[in-house]
């Protein structure tokens, strides 16, 4: 599979998974994973960004992603990025930060960056505080290549 084909598959999956979902401002949720993916500088970052919320926010599974041709190293990264409802947010962030998985750390940084931008634009103070704190925690692990 070519890089372009993989990106197209990820885009199709994300679009189907988030169909009909709206964010806090009433905009289609798909705009967020698209923005996160487009911050990526390589195919793995783009695909992971597009798919980073799919399992957490839909009925899709990691097995389904593998069946669709998403490479196992990306699916493993998505497992790491998926926040279990039984896990505190701090534990979740620590798990990503200390994983040594650069793709997960970069994608989470992009996710937080876009969430922070949306929070500021929408005047969502609680979200801005949460995402600022999370970026402050993650910053030492994210060394901008």
Place the predicted regions along the sequence by residue.
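Active-site helical microenvironments for divalent-metal-assisted chemistry
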Residues: 1-145
């Amino acid at each position: 599979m070519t890089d372009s084909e993989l990106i197209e598959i990820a885009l199709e999956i994300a679009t189907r998974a988030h169909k009909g979902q709206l964010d806090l401002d009433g905009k289609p949720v798909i705009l967020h994973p698209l923005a996160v993916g487009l911050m990526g500088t390589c195919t793995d970052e783009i695909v992971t960004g597009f798919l980073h919320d799919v399992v957490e926010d839909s009925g899709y599974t990691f097995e389904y992603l593998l069946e669709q041709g998403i490479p196992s190293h990306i699916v493993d990264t998505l497992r790491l990025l998926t926040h279990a409802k039984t896990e505190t947010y701090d534990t979740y962030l620590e798990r990503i930060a200390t994983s040594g998985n650069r793709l997960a750390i970069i994608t989470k940084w992009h996710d937080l960056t876009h969430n922070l931008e949306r929070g500021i634009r929408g005047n969502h103070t609680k979200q801005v505080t949460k995402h600022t704190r999370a970026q402050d925690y993650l910053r030492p692990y994210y060394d901008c290549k």
